[in-house]
From Swiss-Prot:
Details of cofactor binding: Divalent metal cation. Can use Mg(2+), Co(2+) or Ni(2+) with similar efficiencies, but is not active in the presence of Mn(2+).
Extent of Basic and acidic residues compositional bias: 297-310, 496-510
UniProt function note: Relaxase involved in plasmid ColE1 conjugative mobilization and is thus essential to promote the specific transfer of the plasmid during conjugation. First catalyzes the specific cleavage of one of the DNA strands at oriT, forming a covalent 5'-phosphotyrosine intermediate. The nic site corresponds to 5'-(1469)CTGG/CTTA(1462)-3' in the cleaved strand. The cleaved strand is then transferred through the dedicated type IV secretion apparatus.
Name listed for the protein in its UniProt record: DNA relaxase MbeA
Comment field (misc): The 100 C-terminal amino acids are dispensable for activity.
Region (Disordered): 281-310, 380-405, 496-517
Superkingdom in the source lineage: Bacteria
Gene: mbeA
Lineage, broadest ranks: Bacteria, Pseudomonadati, Pseudomonadota, Gammaproteobacteria, Enterobacterales
Membrane spanning stretches: none
């Protein structure tokens, strides 16, 4: 078995998913082992980072593994590749290919940590290659698989995965010719290989310690030939077989020492990577930053052309995320969770989900709904579903049922009751939207729809209602003060009018004749 990571990762999500399963999801010999292809595709499309996904393959020379071996190898690879991360912190798609006569386990990982929205880079070759190579050695030894590092398994030709088909066909044809000349006894060393290439009409443009490069007869970039025939160590053809046998014997004798060293390298690498992941993707730290209004992970790496941390988890559950550069998928999630427009009361896409969650809450009241289920993806906390103080920035409308006139006919009690009714109705609508939407969006992002998350969502909505209720107190207090001030002003105005009318009454009084004649 050999682990390969592809250089691709900057396109949309349809590219890798369509390659693994076919455009119509009908590729022959392809089987989905784990993950949701459409979810992975949409997560990749919603990722704002320059490199959107990481992909690769575990390639086996064998056609099949022992029963349960595939699942164990896949789980072990995830733990070693992303130590310190839980299953609900990343998304991965595993697809099996059998169309080449051997087993291939292909994987695709969106480059986004789901709980913080930060950029996730599962594999960086310079830092992670030693750890992955060590894991490869351990797995091959444990299952007795074909070892590509064994001297007897060295390839006579090694080509990069992204080499065009025409160049690949030319390199393979050249190598077959060299191999035929070698077995015929006409090639005894590397110099004979160079001479044979020249006599065949090919131009040798570069010679290094491990390869020979020839010019492409059709133009374009040179073709690099790398393998046993093209290495500097291929100096004596007569002793190649004896040398290979000797190296193979030494390789087998040192197997236990090699395994111990691989175990040490793998453990140390996992410890370092685990500390880095836990520090970088700490849920508490990330949520605190999100509530404070900062963008998680923004600008943490210079090669991220897009804004980091504005797509999912922590930010999407109720925090303000603005900007026209966001993808349509994320804007849809954001608008569904936190609507900055007035609620019109029209039926929404999540009302049915809200009813389902309410029914689930009644059925499972008092029970731990996650208990007894396979904990592949742990249930999120209430804070993860509701997004913390998601209503702190929401403006609660107060216009519904509030009389606008302040004339004497509208009593203060009626206006106060109307204002309270409007505020409570607006807060209740927000609670209903959260109950219906929080579970729907989380299930859309992670593929899980557990009833416990529904209960958490309801609890969060209840807390939101309590916060909305507390906002009524200053409103009512202010209404009382305004009413009292207006009553005082009206009394003063009446008194002033009465004082102005008294002189006028006195002036109109006339002294008549005395009746005492």
């Amino acid at each position: 078995m050999i682990v390969k990571f592809h250089a691709r990762g900057k396109g949309g999500g349809s590219g890798p998913v369509d390659y693994l399963l076919g455009r119509e999801r009908n590729r022959e010999g392809a089987t989905v082992l784990q993950g949701n292809p459409e979810e992975v595709r949409e997560l990749i499309d919603a990722t704002p980072f320059a490199k959107k996904y990481t992909s690769g393959v575990l390639s086996f020379a064998e056609k099949e593994l022992p029963p349960g071996g595939r699942e164990k190898v896949m789980a072990s690879f995830e733990r070693v590749l992303m130590p310190g991360l839980e299953k609900n912190q990343y998304s991965i798609l595993w697809v099996e290919h059998q169309d080449k006569g051997r087993l291939e386990l292909n994987f695709v990982i969106p480059n986004m940590e789901l709980q913080t929205g930060k950029r996730l880079q599962p594999y960086y070759d310079r830092a992670d290659r030693p750890r992955i190579d060590a894991w490869q050695t351990l797995v091959n030894h444990h299952y007795g698989l074909h070892d590509p590092n064994a001297p007897e398994n060295r390839r006579t030709l090694t080509l990069p995965d992204n080499l065009p088909e025409t160049k690949q066909a030319l390199a393979e044809g050249v190598t077959r010719g060299i191999d035929a000349l070698y077995h015929a006894g006409e090639i005894k060393g590397r110099q004979d290989v160079i001479q044979a290439l020249t006599e065949a009409g090919l131009e040798v443009v570069r010679v290094t310690r491990t390869s020979i490069s020839i010019a492409d007869p059709n133009g374009g970039k040179n073709i690099r030939l790398k393998g046993a025939f093209y290495e500097q160590s291929f100096a004596d053809g007569r002793g190649v077989r004896e040398k290979a046998e000797r190296e193979s014997r030494i390789y087998r004798e040192n197997a236990e020492q090699r395994v111990q060293e691989a175990r040490r390298i793998c453990k140390r690498g996992c410890d370092i990577k685990r500390d880095e992941n836990q520090r970088r993707y700490s849920p508490v730290h990330s949520l605190d930053r999100g509530i404070a209004g900062k963008t998680p992970g923004r600008g943490e790496r210079g090669d991220d052309a897009a804004q980091e941390g504005r797509v999912k988890a922590g930010r999407e559950y109720g925090h303000d995320v603005t900007g026209d550069s966001l993808s349509p998928v994320y804007r849809e999630w954001r608008d569904a969770l936190v609507s900055w427009r007035e609620d019109t009361g029209e039926p929404g896409r999540n009302q049915e989900a809200g009813r389902d969650i309410a029914e689930t809450e009644r059925e499972d009241m008092g029970r731990g709904v996650c208990a007894g289920r396979e904990q592949e993806i742990p249930c999120p906390s209430v804070r993860e579903i509701s997004g913390g103080d998601s209503l702190s920035g929401e403006r609660v409308g107060t216009s519904e049922g509030v009389t606008q006139s302040d004339r004497a006919g509208n009593t203060f009690a009626e206006r106060l009751r109307a204002a309270a009714t409007g505020l409570y109705a607006a807060a209740e609508r927000m609670g209903e939207r959260l109950r219906g939407i929080a579970e729907d969006v989380f299930a859309y992002a992670t593929g899980q729809r557990d009833a416990e998350r529904a209960g958490h969502a309801v609890e969060s909505a209840g807390a939101a209602l309590e916060r909305a209720d507390r906002t009524l107190e200053p409103v009512i207090q202010r209404e009382l003060e305004i009413r009292e001030e207006r009553l005082i002003q009206e009394r003063e105005h009446v008194l002033s009018l009465e004082r102005e009318r008294q002189p006028e009454i006195q002036e109109r009084t006339l002294d008549g004749p005395s009746l005492g004649w």
